[in-house]
């Protein structure tokens, strides 16, 4: 009995020594990484993090260790960059070093390193170049896409008028409208607002996007190697992503059957033509998997981020009726009520422009940014980041950097106005990220936000069932994404 007890004690002692040696070796190997809390085997720094408030948890660690620190999400080792200076220094000044793509576990379950958004820089570079060029060919940045947005805005105005002032949830009104703009580019046509398949797709996008912001979604980011095999909300997110992929694949099959290489109808046609041109190149990135998943990247990003920003923006304007009134006054003075807004009106509407920028800043749609990865051993400040190190560029910490924004936690359009009331740019305005992997749809999103907001506000006043002081503008979830609370509102004709 005594011998077995001694043997057990010896085994436990050996195990403890092995764990301590493992941690010591890791710390030695990572000796030039930024400081951070000591991780435990497998669970990393889980005990120091609150998955319900992941962003705030990371900011508390920043307060202790500084703007550049190391954190372990389960077994994942990540360097976190906070504030405008650190993020710009990495993504702009050392853009090539930080151009790799880190993990986003929920989406990686489907994409597995393919498509333009979640792939390595080597794969993403030709796909980005092609996507930007093709979007331009189909009118992005030109008068053609502006007319398409104006047309879609007209459909939305009629849909709001049909509600006759009833209190409604604006979620799918907005996502249908925004999605139809990118759909006209990637699929060559818009959907009818009552199309059941279309509404199903929008629910799939919203569901999977919201999952990434939930506590379970944050837990999945840490322990996906185990959780992907277990029941739970992550399985529903996988089904939704699969459903979206299958829909895109059917669209591609349809285009293949009717393709005219001399007359591309949409993004899918253009990609198919490029595939034919490079079919003899074994290293070409223009193949079926990248076609389906790049199209899904464009469809998803072109729908969910802008529509969610607008939905959050409406809530903020109901909370701040004085801001809404000033926007109405500027619209009436510059545009009037008898014509649709144009993108060129933006130059004469500094207050409206400031409000839209402040909505984007305050809503902070992707607070932790899309994870990056250093492409080689990289010296950053006083640290050495080994090749392959994951990096979180905390865009939320840039958009709330007190060095640039006097009231970072408040909705305050004056952040973007000078003393003369003219629009003022900010070096810390990075909702689309920066560097080599900035959002390739930035130009389209800016045009959509301005034209949709001004057209809606030209025609309607917003009414809440709550008094302004009772409206809660804190987010429902903050994780990979920021998700506003569900609410109802009335669109009152002006």
UniProtKB/Swiss-Prot annotation:
Location of this chain's protein in the cell: Endoplasmic reticulum membrane; Microsome membrane
Purpose of the protein: Catalyzes the oxygenation of a variety of substrates, including ethanol and procarcinogens such as N-nitrosodiethylamine and phenacetin. Has no or little activity as a coumarin 7-hydroxylase and in the formation of androstenedione from testosterone.
Enzyme Commission (EC) number: 1.14.14.1
SUPFAM superfamilies: Cytochrome P450 (SSF48264)
Organism whose genome encodes this protein: Oryctolagus cuniculus (Rabbit)
Primary enzyme class: oxidoreductase
Entry comment describing in which tissues the protein is expressed: Expressed in liver and lung as well as in nasal tissues.
Annotated signal sequence range: none
UniProt protein name: Cytochrome P450 2A11
